[in-house]
Amino acid sequence: MLSVAPTVGGGGRAAAQETPAADAAGAEVAPATEAVAPGPDPNAFRVHFGFEGKAHYRDSEQLRLPSPFPFPPESLPPGATQGFLESVNEGGHFELSVLTLFADASWGPNIEAHAKLDFIDLYDRNPTSSDKQFDVDELWIRFGGDPAAPVDGFGMYARVGKFGHFERQNDRHTESYGLVSTAFNRFEDQGLEIGANFGGHFYLVGSLTQGNPVFFRDPNALAGDNGTPENDPSLHDHPVPELQSGFPILYDAEVEDLDVDGDLETGYGLGLRFGEPGSGHEVSFLAWAYQRKMAETVALNGTFYGGDIDLLNGPQNLFGLPIHGNDKKEVGGNLWIYQGGFSFFGQYVQQEIAGMDRTGYEGEVAWRFDLPLAWAAGGRQLFPYLQPVVRYSFLKPEFAGGSPRFPAPSVRWEWTKLDYGLRMGIIEGVDLTIEFADNEMTLANGSKVSNDELLTTLRFRM
């Protein structure tokens, strides 16, 4: 009888041949050659989108202290004779702070682009009530390998656009920020960053950027309202603000429009790391520095106050801080340690800003505990982990001299902030963080005051 068997190398054609013995014993059939599915092309163009939202319950302690500035009567609420620094929005509040759209594109391992678009942006807005509610937080393209990826030999990269400072802590374990992170590297800058890796341990990085303007904000969740159109006495007599000034510190604010005229900020970093990045077992140290010339003024969205020298000079250039020149310099060192579920981040900074000195340091310890599988939903574990976190930060301005009537004496205060909290995974892509900020400020007369805050954050990602 006839049987049909594939022929090896026959291009998929079958050959018919007589096999008389097949009726008795069966015929051996040559095995078919299995087609191996090709793997994904590592050089293919890929695009990925993501989304994140954050909802909160915030409870802020009430604190009200007199401002030494002689506000004109028309700029004060009806019947008031004195201006005050006051908690931005005391009491308990439910609020949606941000909706974020992410977009990532890559073309092989050496070309990558990233965009991060924020909507609402409540906790980044400054002033809180009048700043823009949409922000292009990051927008950059990188040529060369990922600087965080392990490299056996020499490698270089260049990144251009709007991106975070290279020394910034990008894996913060709370929703809040420490004093040092708030003051020096919370917000992105825009320009050019170049880096080089030398084997697996040593790397260099440098940047040439626009430079974040100097402004002030409260270190708690809400930045506060200072210089808003609603509080402008030339537009509204005796305004009654819904949000208050807060207790602002000087900080590097968000860059607004692209401006590369004049002096740019230069940054340098020298790093040393051990262990494989992303493996959970890594130690990394980075020494870094920035310097630039401050502008006479910088226009900022939502406020009639100017940034840089204009802010430091005070109203009418008569009630300023003790500034000399326009140099702005920072020198710092950062340490990251990862060991399994344990992580540590530390940062120390010395700053000279228009002849005034300021130092600060902070350290954050977190430990993630993976929980055993007890419940699941939709094939995903419920309550997969717990992560307690503690952070201590300290900021010491040395701004002696100048006018005692500068409107925000809080920029001169010695400040300590202890943040402690717990992050709990609810299900993949959803977590809950409960944290408490214990603020202690030392006033000019040596007395101490507090401006504490409880913050609960429900974060969802997809």
Language model regions located:
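N-terminal periplasmic/intermembrane-space "pro-region" immediately following the signal or transit peptide
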Residues: 2-84, 375, 462
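Intrinsically disordered, low-complexity regions of eukaryotic proteins
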Residues: 20, 25, 30, 36, ...
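Outer-membrane beta-barrel pore domains
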Residues: 20-21, 26, 42, 62-63, ...
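Outer membrane beta-barrel
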Residues: 38-65, 86-222, 262-266, 272-279, ...
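Outer-membrane pore/translocation modules
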Residues: 58-83, 167-179, 210-336, 412
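Short, intrinsically disordered/low-complexity patches at protein termini
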Residues: 72, 181-183, 192-193, 226-230, ...
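Short, surface-exposed, polar/charged, turn-prone segments marking secondary-structure boundaries
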Residues: 77-82, 123, 185-190, 233-235, ...
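Glycine/serine-rich loop-strand microenvironments at binding/catalytic pocket rims
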Residues: 99-131, 192-260, 323-358, 362, ...
